[in-house]
């Protein structure tokens, strides 16, 4: 098994394709490469008879695991989302230098966590993986006090068509950090 843990998008995809070409299973930890090249890499892995998968543990894979659980219990997925603690869409690699230095992080990577880039990549992976969509470009991302407050911010009777799941995120929800899935079941 080969693990792709590079932060280089093209290099990560090339690594995975080379591993697949050598009949190695691939666990991809590079969500950016997975978003852009994942469907192609999966098709190549299937042709070769090996496994290509995302690593469990990042938001998009934890969301998918929750979806698998609620669907096993007989629920239909209505919304899948991320609980983001902080978002500054004006952040950039230069402005984030002091914060990145405190955390010993790469400036571009830290900016991507702060400006919503990473959030959008993860939610695009979820949407592509489950056939979901956003309600509006960029998602809503309301501020909520508690995760259960999301029912006050999303009118699911208007947003959800009964079939296609929605992806979105909430800001500053309690408990901090994490992911959520809203399911529906009409059985008592």
What function would you assign to each model-found segment?
Residues 2-4:
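Redox-cofactor binding/interface segments in oxidoreductases and associated redox assembly factors
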Residues 6-22, 29-51, 55-57:
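Rossmann-fold NAD(P)-binding glycine/threonine-rich loop
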Residues 9, 34, 38, 59, ...:
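Generic structural signal for well-ordered, non-membrane alpha-helical segments
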Residues 26, 51-52, 77, 134:
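Hydrophobic beta-strand scaffold residues
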Residues 45-47, 53-118:
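Rossmann-like NAD(P)H-binding beta-loop-alpha module
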Residues 99-188:
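C-terminal catalytic/substrate-binding lobe primarily of soluble NAD(P)-dependent oxidoreductases
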